[in-house]
From Swiss-Prot:
UniProt cross-references to Pfam families, sorted A to Z: GATase, GMP_synt_C, NAD_synthase
GO molecular function: ATP binding; GMP synthase activity
Function, in words: Catalyzes the synthesis of GMP from XMP.
Keyword annotations from UniProtKB, A to Z: ATP-binding, Glutamine amidotransferase, GMP biosynthesis, Ligase, Nucleotide-binding, Purine biosynthesis
Active-site residue list: 81, 168, 170
Alphabetized PROSITE patterns for the sequence: GATASE_TYPE_1 (PS51273), GMPS_ATP_PPASE (PS51553)
Record's protein name: GMP synthase [glutamine-hydrolyzing]
Entry-linked HAMAP family: GMP_synthase
Domain GMPS ATP-PPase: 195-387
Amino acid sequence: MPQTIAVLDFGSQLTQVIARRIRECQVYSKIYHFSTPAAQLREEGVIGIILSGGPQSVYARKAPHPDPAIFELGVPILGICYGVQLMGHFLGGKVELSTAREYGHGHLTIKRPGKLFAGLPRKLRIWNSHGDRLAKLPPGFAATAISENSPYAGIEDRTRQFYGIQFHPEVFHTERGVDMIRNFLLGVCGAKQDWTTKDFIAHAVADIRAKAGKSRVILGLSGGVDSSVAAALLHKAIGRQLTCVFVDNGLLRKGERDYVEALYKKHFHIDLRIVDASKLFLKRLKGVTEPEQKRKIIGRTFVEVFEKALKTVGHADFLGQGTLYPDVIESVSIGNNPASVIKTHHNVGGLPERMKLKLIEPLRELFKDEVRKVGAALGLPKEVVWRQPFPGPGLGVRVMGEITAANLEILRNADAVLHEEMMASGYYYKVWQSFCVFLPVRTVGVFGDERTYDYVVALRVVESIDAMTADWAKLPHELLQHISSRITNEVRGVSRVVLDISSKPPATIEWE
């Protein structure tokens, strides 16, 4: 196993970002609950600890505090924002409410570079988010940097290798922030950079073989990035012991079923079973217009269809899943609990426990960007590795109102035009998502000398990093005009195309 950096989570919304930045430096990181016993961290062999930020004051009645014994483990520690205040509080310093709170952009002046700031310019732009500040240094510490309102924006205890910073190096707003993290990992902790795609694949293949033995593994394949990479990794490990089940729910994009069949059956030679349940899904969705009800019907029907499909496949001991690392982190309200608490992941897509299948989740240690790297290394085509997110209920949440075969056909054809033009123009891989939405509204149009009364299609194209926030993409007007012209001319039943220019928040990316 690779060397591990422990990230203790104290409720920061940026905890996952810290973990990702560490991995970008080819060092393995793992997020732990803030109260994780020091003994556990010692047993798991962590070579360094990062204390995350958090929304609380260290003096608050229910403020999250770590096991004090972590400071006796003899490993380097880096405190970020709330984390540096914890270090001050526990090690004999003093924390106080700042007279001028620091939020947003700020400026850092480095006084003593030391190992943390080695090789960096003396002055840097940083990103702040704190109301408290360190007012008195703990014994053994020295100030290394200052900001506008903090005389201790950077501190260090070289003997114990404890470092603290009163800003967020993990966000892109902080200039050279990743270099600071890298300095801590390599220069202070002595990390070997042994977390690579090649090494992960080798370890994952060995783990899958050890766990599965000669047993059969069933994987629900959607054609999306996560399930595709999981399928490729499982197949590399156990070959013919893997059977994939693809459910055609009638809510797929144009040509999707044929594409999946060609890719996995013919290219990867995976045992793929395709179940056509499109008529059943549409029958159960008939007359339903409420979004949440549609989602529940689609979810329940999928579970039922998938369970029946498994009976035709034959005996299997394991169910494979494309679970990712963010999936095993449960978001909870801030209070005495952190924003991200590691939990045992039991979400198997709603599949009944009576199936008594054990889980194999080969991607559960990875973030999305790492999954894409693994997919590329396993030989998956670019259009799969970099495929845009697609909702679980499929086009069912992109048809407003009742889902009918006719409405789906209109949406499917319009979406295909948008996809073609986004690919041809080179914008497909530059945006987070681009798709069409069918609106059950008829408007007056003119074709030739005849008046028409046809439907409206909305274009939704957004830019984002993690889907938590998003902004509408400013595509060239000429491209938008061409897309609109093609849809209204080539897709029967559409007379008007509109553009959604809403950001998230307040709008969500999907319409339902």
